[in-house]
Amino acid sequence: MLRPSILGAFLALVLSLCVVTPAQAVPDGPIEIYLEHIEPLSLAWPADGTLTSGYGPRWGRMHLGLDVGILRSLDVRAATSGTVTAAGWLTGYEGYGNVVTIDVGGGWSLLYAHLSESHVVPGQWVDAGQSVGLAGCTGSCTGTHLHFELREHGTPVDPAPFFG
């Protein structure tokens, strides 16, 4: 155990090494600051169809994505590039039917639901515009359509402002 006098001397020494004088605090030349460049998220429309239902309250509950009216078996495309994280029927998402999810970086992910089939597998890189599956009506749906979600750190957000 350290005696109080030794501990006090040690603390005084440490504190004396941490003192910054005004002359040391002001640089004598230009300061270089490096900032990471982060591209804003921009999405392409994921299917050849029209918006049939938007994000927000619907039928007394929250609709967490966009519904796109599309003919059965037409291609559903990646709205931007990323890595497939899931494809198929997912536990906890039974109402969504056949699903594809894509991690697009920066905490953002995409979810495509009600597909009749998927064309991708987990771990696969997809380019923007590449087919991820075919439109269908799997899970809980009343007709063929694509349900499309944008998620930020797992939380659904309105994708509409991100379409370029």
Q: What residue spans do the PLM features occupy?
A:
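Zn2+-dependent peptidoglycan hydrolase active-site motif and core
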Residues: 63-64, 79-119, 144-146
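Intrinsically disordered, low-complexity
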Residues: 2-55, 83, 121, 127-130, ...
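Generic structural signal for buried aliphatic residues
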Residues: 74-76, 84-85, 126, 132
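ATP/adenylate-binding site constellation spanning eukaryotic-like Ser/Thr protein kinases
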Residues: 48, 73, 81, 117, ...
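Short glycine/threonine/proline-enriched tight-turn/helix- or strand-capping micro-motif at secondary-structure
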Residues: 48-78
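Small beta-strand-rich domains/subdomains or short beta-sheet motifs embedded
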Residues: 44, 69, 75-79, 112-113, ...
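Conserved, short, structured surface segments that act as functional micro-motifs
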Residues: 96-104, 116, 124-164
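A residue-level detector for short acidic-glycine micro-motifs
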Residues: 53, 70, 86, 114-117, ...
